[in-house]
Structure formats: structure tokens, C-alpha cells
Design a protein with these regions (language model features):
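Beta1/beta-strand and adjacent pyrophosphate-binding region of the FAD-binding site
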Residues: 1-12, 170-180
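Glycine-rich flavin
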Residues: 2-4, 20-27, 32-171, 198, ...
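Flexible, glycine-rich terminal cap/loop adjacent to redox cofactors
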Residues: 7-14, 20-35, 40, 47, ...
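Short hydrophobic core segments
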Residues: 7-9, 113, 132-143, 176-177, ...
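N-terminal Rossmann-fold NAD(P) dinucleotide-binding loop
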Residues: 15, 183-184
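Gly/Ala-rich phosphate-binding loop of Rossmann-like dinucleotide-binding domains
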Residues: 19, 23, 187, 191-192
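Hydrophobic "anchor" residues
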Residues: 48, 121, 271, 298, ...
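FAD-site-proximal beta/loop scaffold in flavoenzymes
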Residues: 155-170, 257-330
């Protein structure tokens, strides 16, 4: 008889949620984790960055409160205390996961996992000792790690993992290589605190994978905050320049150099499955990611993979949804989440949240569309908060009238995009989504204005 019915490798959002769901459905479960419960998300990603952004927003709002009668003197940011706060939040949430495991009678096996065969996992402790476990099924949820391309001198730059370890002082200046989600959130954090920030992006705009207007609007807002932005810029090398680091790059066929006390490499992440399989044991790969079928099964029978290690979309909530769907199918339960509808958020100011297709993506697929848009200059909550130019765009199929996409750039966009995702998952038409009464004053009432514009264009 096997030791467990399911062994999950990795206690990040995909792994721990899958384990809890499997235990609830009656499986005997173990989770292997070599670091803190919660994985990258809780300890080196989503939660630490949002904690830092929460702290920097308090500083920014207090420092800039004179226009509404709030006057502060001698306000300063203590970086050691900010990072201590970040660690406390992560530790509290990580401890919460371990408590959930105990309640669900899930064994947490501390150590590094090695898959020695289908249904066989060896767990090595830090002291070098190892134990072998057998199981009916294995679920790989080992996530991803920061990428560092082979650019001369880039080893001098920090990754997001290293930056989040903390620093006891505020950098005078920081150069961020990469204008995607990770780079933009760190740019927001450091700009809020008064650090001189430069962002270097290789594509023609910030957030190149998103709607063009989002990146363009964000660049304007960041520049107003004093952030220097270079696009169409290719980094050639990084080198020490006295106490600073110099980043040399080409931009519009010109050689440029910017220097900073620190440099952050934020140009993506790669699937992490290094050393996961014993010699002679392996699975089919899709580039550097583990290849899976429609049920998340790898080429090795009874071995499954979910989340960043196998998915094109590297988001915590995608890993969670995939993990739950995988174990539900293993248990013969109908999974309930539409995995094709994926919201994505960026926690800059104003926030950005998207779901579904952009107008350009729909047209590339040959889908006839109409787009409704509302610029929130007259939205009362936006006028009060004054985060910069905000807007909402909604994309609908021109013939079926169903909503197929949304792009929000406004305060609390991340808290509203779930409702739009619900509309997409249930194939609601623009008229059906417009029926709901939305509160006033609120940021969300701009959704009604965008929907009314969309319905008018649909005719």
C-alpha cells in the first residue's frame, strides 16, 4: 500500500490549494516544500511586493496631502522597518497555510523532492539524509524563478528575489531593466519613496503584452512622477562605475548610459524544475516548461504539473485554479472554473487590470468587435483620489454582443476585474452586464458609463 494517495511538490498557491482540495475530497496527502509554505507568491512575489506598495502609498499620500489639508513634517521612510513589516506579513500568511495543513491532516515534508519514478518521491533533508515515499499520483507545483539573460555584467544586477531580501537604506537611484509587471511595480514603489528611477524596456512600449493604450498612459503618468522611461532600448552591458552601476544600452540607434546605486533585472521568469527528476527519469518538455495534456498529466504516467512550471501564464491564481481542477478530475469531481478566462493585475497607480481579449487581439483572430470606453475625468471618486488619467475599455463581439475583453486603468481596478471575468465566463452580453445598478459614488460606476457607450456602438 502506498504511503500517500497524492504527493504535491511545492507549497505555493497552486500546490497548497490543490493539497487542501484533495484532502477535502478524501485523499491522503503530503506536500514537499524545501522553503517557506506559500512559495514565491507569499514570500518572494505577490504578497511582499503588495506589502511594500501599501507602505509606499501611505508615505506618498501623507507627503502629498497638502492639497486636501493634510500637512506633515519630518516624514521619512525607514527601509529596515518597511522590510521588517513585509517579512511579518509573509510569515503570518505562511504560518496560516501550515495551520490549514494540520487541520486538514496533510503531512508537510520538509526538504528537496526528487522524483525517482512514477509514484516514487525521495525527500532529502538539509543535513543530507533522505526518505523515500510512495504514492498513487504526484503533482508538480514547483513554480518559477527569475530569468537572467546572458548580458555581460548582468550578474551585478539584482533579481526580484534578491531585492526583496531587503536593504537598510533607500537607494539614491535604481535602474530597472524590464517594463513589464514586475518592473513597473518596483518602479512605483521606489518612485513613491522619492528614489530616482529609470525603466529600460526592449519593446516599443511599457507592458508590451497588454493593450497599447495602457502602456502609453502608464508611461505618461510615470514620467509625471519623475520616472525616466526608455523604450525600444536594448541593454548591452552592465558595469561598475565607482559606487554606482552603469547600464549601457542602445535606444533609437543611439548609445545611451544610465547609472544607479542599484540595478534590478526584471525581464521575466522561467519554469523551475531543476534537479527534480532522477537520472533515467524524466518528462517531455515544452522548451524549459514541463509539457502537459488537457488534464495536466505529463508524459510520465500519474505525474501531473500545474502553475508556472508548466503554464504559459505565470500567475498565482492561474496556478491555484489549475491545481484545484487537476485534483478534482483525479477525484472524479466536475471542476467548475473556466480556465480560459484569466484576469491579470498590475498594482501601480492607478492600478491596471485586464481580462480576455484586447481590440487588437480580437481583430487578429478575425473577430468583429465593438469597443466601449469611458475616461474617468468626471468620476467623483477619481477626482477625489487624483491618481492621474483613468479609463475603462470593454470589448464585445459585434454580432453576438457578448463581452470578450476588458481593460481597466483606475483606482481599485484589481478589485473590479473579477466581476468582469464573471461576465466573460458566463457569456453575458453588454446589455446583460449593464443591468446591474452600481453604487454612487464609486470607481465602479464608470463601468456603467463604458457599457452604455458599448451598447450604443453595438446599435
Amino acid at each position: 500500500m502506498a504511503d500517500y494517495q497524492l504527493i504535491v511538490i511545492g507549497a505555493g498557491p497552486g500546490g497548497y490549494e490543490a493539497a487542501l482540495r484533495a484532502a477535502k475530497l478524501g485523499k491522503k496527502v503530503a506536500v514537499v516544500e524545501r522553503r517557506e509554505a506559500g512559495g514565491t507568491c507569499l514570500n518572494r512575489g505577490c504578497i511582499p511586493t503588495k506589502t511594500l506598495l501599501h507602505a509606499s502609498a501611505i508615505y506618498r499620500d501623507a507627503k502629498n496631502g497638502a492639497h486636501c489639508g493634510i500637512h506633515t513634517e519630518d516624514i521619512h521612510a525607514d527601509m529596515a522597518e518597511i522590510f521588517a513589516y513585509k517579512r511579518a506579513v509573509s510569515q503570518k500568511l505562511s504560518a496560516g497555510i501550515e495551520s490549514l495543513f494540520k487541520t486538514a491532516k496533510i503531512d508537510l515534508l520538509r526538504g528537496t523532492a526528487l522524483i525517482t519514478g512514477s509514484g516514487c518521491v525521495r525527500v532529502a533533508d538539509a543535513d543530507g539524509s533522505a526518505n523515500d515515499y510512495t504514492c498513487d499520483d504526484i503533482l508538480i507545483a514547483t513554480g518559477s524563478v527569475p530569468s537572467r539573460p546572458p548580458i555581460p555584467g548582468l550578474e551585478l544586477a539584482m533579481t526580484s528575489d534578491e531585492l526583496l531580501e531587503g536593504c537598510d537604506h533607500l537607494y539614491r537611484s535604481i535602474v530597472i531593466i524590464g517594463g513589464g509587471v514586475i518592473g513597473i511595480e518596483f518602479a512605483t514603489f521606489y518612485a513613491d519613496l522619492g528614489c530616482a528611477v529609470t525603466v529600460i524596456e526592449g519593446m516599443d512600449r511599457l507592458l508590451p503584452s497588454m493593450d497599447k493604450e495602457l502602456g502609453q498612459n502608464l508611461a505618461l503618468i510615470l514620467k509625471k512622477q519623475g520616472v525616466k522611461v526608455f523604450t525600444n532600448a536594448m541593454v548591452q552591458r552592465v558595469e561598475q562605475a565607482g559606487e554606482d552601476l552603469a547600464v549601457h544600452f542602445t535606444c533609437k540607434e543611439k548609445e545611451e548610459t544610465v547609472s544607479g546605486e542599484a540595478v534590478l533585472c526584471a525581464i521575466g521568469r522561467r519554469a523551475y524544475c531543476d534537479g527534480l527528476f532522477a537520472d533515467g527519469v524524466g518528462v517531455k518538455m515544452n522548451g524549459r516548461s514541463i509539457a502537459v495534456d488537457g488534464n495536466f498529466e505529463t508524459s510520465l504516467p500519474h505525474v501531473y504539473a500545474i502553475g508556472d512550471v508548466s503554464s504559459k501564464i505565470q500567475l498565482a491564481h492561474v496556478a491555484t485554479a489549475q491545481g484545484i481542477a487537476c485534483v478534482e478530475r483525479l477525484c472524479g469531481v466536475q471542476d467548475h472554473t473556466d480556465l480560459s478566462v484569466v484576469p491579470s493585475c498590475i498594482y501601480c497607480r492607478p492600478e491596471i487590470a485586464v481580462v480576455g481579449l484586447t481590440e487588437a487581439e480580437a481583430k487578429e483572430k478575425g473577430i468583429p468587435v465593438k469597443v466601449g470606453k469611458h475616461v474617468m475625468f468626471g468620476n467623483a471618486k477619481t477626482v477625489i483620489a487624483d491618481p492621474g488619467r483613468c479609463f475603462m475599455k470593454l470589448v464585445a463581439h459585434a454580432e453576438t454582443r457578448e463581452l470578450i475583453g476588458a481593460q481597466l486603468m483606475c483606482e481599485h481596478a484589481s478589485d473590479m476585474i473579477g466581476g468582469v471575468a464573471q461576465a466573460l465566463a458566463n457569456h453575458l452580453t453588454a446589455e446583460q452586464f449593464c443591468r446591474a445598478m452600481r453604487p454612487h459614488p464609486s470607481f465602479e460606476e464608470a463601468m456603467t458609463a463604458a457599457l452604455e457607450d458599448l451598447c450604443e456602438k453595438l446599435g
